[in-house]
Amino acid sequence: YFSYNDKIIKILEAEYLNADHHFTSGTVISDKLEIACGSGILRVKKLQQESKKALNIEEFLCGTNILKDTVLK
């Protein structure tokens, strides 16, 4: 999970990409919500915002804009 705009967002489904990068862990590196992690990239596929129903990434991004280069915690 991560926090964004003071809301907890659970990652329900994701794909790990074994790829080298130079980003800080937690950095959003694409507009498709790919997140840099220690030794690769996490491509989020399904998530659930606090007190909301689960959504696939396309549905989520229609209503929530998490900008590239945002560092998630």
Curated annotation (Swiss-Prot):
The keyword Magnesium does not apply. Attaches a formyl group to the free amino group of methionyl-tRNA(fMet). The formyl group appears to play a dual role in the initiator identity of N-formylmethionyl-tRNA by promoting its recognition by IF2 and preventing the misappropriation of this tRNA by the elongation apparatus. Keywords: Protein biosynthesis, Transferase. Belongs to the Fmt family. Its EC number is 2.1.2.9. CDD domains: Met_tRNA_FMT_C. This is Methionyl-tRNA formyltransferase. It is an enzyme of class 2 (transferase). It catalyses: L-methionyl-tRNA(fMet) + (6R)-10-formyltetrahydrofolate = N-formyl-L-methionyl-tRNA(fMet) + (6S)-5,6,7,8-tetrahydrofolate + H(+). Gene3D superfamilies: Formyl transferase, C-terminal domain.
